[in-house]
Amino acid sequence: KTFDVAIVDEATQILEPQLLGLLCARNVVGNNAIGKFILIGDHKQLPAVVLQSESQSEVCEECLQSIGLYNLKDSLFERLYRTVSANHSSPTTQRFYDMLCRQGRMNVEVARFPNHAFYGGLLEAVGLPHQQGELVLAPGLENDEFADVLVSRVAFLPSVPETPSQSAKINHSEAQLTA
């Protein structure tokens, strides 16, 4: 089979070896089976899950570094974005990527933090009803020590970091705070 376009969603969470079959796919006459790829993702959100440390996944070969492959934990999306944005001053590279600026998932209060911390204030709320609703405190919790936190969409509760010998996937202190 041959496809004009392959759309890869959440591409920042997919490592290159996982895409290799698609990237190298050939049709019966030996031509590319996929005409072009569209990678959709957000390099400022969750990366691919890799259990190796930064040093274990580091690329040392100069020939691979010359194509922007510095760490095996980076997705193809991240590598291509880094390469193109490094040459952003060129008019031809500006057409390779864009940013969706309207979001319809998060409540406006929740979106405020990532909008300013990661997106330079470029995100706009679509204005859907669920983005504007107020939080109501459940009956019986009016005197709870965390009542003000429970009606806030965003709060910071400091936690104790886990010791390096424990799994990076578990933080008992954070679990206790949220339970």
Label for each model-derived stretch:
Residues 1-179:
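Conserved helicase motor core of SF1/SF2 NTP-dependent helicases
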